[in-house]
Amino acid sequence: MSKEEFMKIQTCVLKVNIHCDGCKQKVKKILQKIEGVFTTKIDSEQGKVTVSGSVDPSVLIKKLAKSGKHAEIWGAPKGNNNPNQSQMANQFKGMQIDHGKAGGGGGGNNNNNKKGQKNGGGGGGGGGGGNSNAPKMGQQLNPQHLQQLQQLQKMKGFQDLKLPPQLKGSVPVNKNQNQKGVKFDVPEDDDDDDFSDEFDDEFTDDDDDEFDDEFDDLPLPSNKMKPNMTMMPNAQQMMMNAQKNANLAGGPAKNGGKGAPAAGGGGAGGGKGAGGGAKGGPGNQNQGGGKNGGGGHPQDGKNGGGGGGPNAGKKGNGGGGPMAGGVSGGFRPMGGGGPQNMSMPMGGQMGMGGPMGNMPAVQGLPATGPGGAPQGYFQGAGIDPMQMQQQQQQQQYLAAVMNQQRAMGNERFQPMMYARPPPAVNYMPPNPHQYPNPHPYPYPYPYPYPPPYGNDQYSHAFSDENTSSCDIM
C-alpha cells in the first residue's frame, strides 16, 4: 500500500437503525460491497457502525438509505483528511459572516441583510450585499449546519480546516449566528407583548369593567326583592310585581292598567289615566283596577274593590294569572286591604302542591302524602298495605321503632350510614288471619330483608355483629 493510499484511509462512525441480528448482517453486507471499505465494525446495541476506508461517508449513507436503512454521522471521525470536513469547509467558504451588524454604508461583504439581496454594493442605508456568493434567506445556517459546525470544533483536525477567520476558533460568532439563524424579521417579544396587551385591554379588562359598572356595583332598589334561587323566574316576577303594587296601593296609577309589562288583560273599567277608569278605583301600576277587571297578577281581583291591594280577592273575571279566577296551587289567597309588603308564603314544596302530585298543603303544615299520612324526609311516602301485613314479623325492630317515631305519625326513618331502612310500622290491630305470615308477596324494597328465624330471633337482634338489625347503633 502506497503512502498516498495510506493517507486516504479514514475512519467514519455512522449511526444506523439496527433492530436485530438480521439488520446487523444486512448492514454489514451492504458496507462490504462498497468499494474503498476496508473494515467494518458494528455495535448493534447502540446502533454504532465504524467503517474504515477511503470512501466518502456520504456514499455510505446513500447506499444504506437505498437499502432502507437510515444512517447518520456519529460523533467526531478520526483522521485529518476527512471529506466531511472538506465538505463543511466548502459550505462555509462562500459565507463571510459578520457579527450581525446591518451596515449603513452598504459594504461589499455585509451579506446578512434580512432580505438576502444579491445586488452588488450599492451603498445606502440598507447595506446591500456585494458578494455574489451571499446566501439567500433560505440558505442561512439551519440548526443542522450549526450542529455539524459544533462537531467540527470538537474534531481533532479542526486547526487544519481552511475556514474563514470569522469561524476559526470563535465560539461567540457561532452563538451569534445561531441567533441570526432562528430569528424572524419581526421582533417576537414586541409582538407577544402587544398581542397580550391587546387582548387584555380590549377584551378582558373592558368586559370586566362593563359588567362591574352595569350589573355588579348597582344596589337593588327598595321596591325590588333579591331573587330567590329556588323559584322559577315567573314566580319571582310575580312576587316583585306584588310588592310594587302593595307599595303603590291607594294612589293614582301612573300608566293605568295597560302600561306595566306584567299587566293582565285589564277589566272593563280598567283605568287608563292618572285618575283611573270610569268605574274603577285609583288603579295600580300593574293592575287593571275596575270592578269587573282582575288585575295583572296570579291572584285575580274580587269584583274590583277599587284596585286597592296587590291581589283583590278570588273571583276575578279576567286577568293574566296562571290560574285565573282561583287560587293557584300552593299560593295563599292575598287580601285586598293594605300594603301587605310581599306577603306570599310558599305552602308545601315550592308552591307546587306537594312533590308527587298530592293535594296542596295548608300554610304552616307539611304537605300530606298519598295515603293521608304526613310526609317526613321522604316526600310522598305513605302507608304500604304490604307492610301492614308484615308487621308481626318485624318484632326485632320494635325497640328501634319506639325511639324513632315522630310527632306526625307514620313516617320513614332517617337514613343511617350502615343500616337498611326499616319499613314503617303502623300501630293497628293485627290481622289474626295473617299470623304467621308465610311471605306471600315479595318485599317492596330493592333488597329484601332476611326472613326471621323460627326460634332464635332475639339472640342476634341487638348483636354487635348484626349491624342491620338495630338503628340505635
UniProtKB/Swiss-Prot annotation:
GO terms for molecular function: metal ion binding. InterPro entries: HMA_dom, HMA_dom_sf. A lipid is attached at residue 470 (S-farnesyl cysteine). Residues 96-139, 162-230, 246-343 are annotated as: Disordered. Induction: Down-regulated by cadmium. Residues 9-72 form the HMA domain. The modification Cysteine methyl ester is found at residue 470. It comes from the Eukaryota. GO terms for cellular component: plant-type cell wall. Residues 187-217 have a biased composition (Acidic residues). Residues 471-473 form a propeptide. Keywords: Lipoprotein, Metal-binding, Methylation, Prenylation. Coiled coil: none annotated. A metal cation binds at residues 20, 23. Belongs to the HIPP family. Heavy-metal-binding protein. This is Heavy metal-associated isoprenylated plant protein 32. The gene is HIPP32.
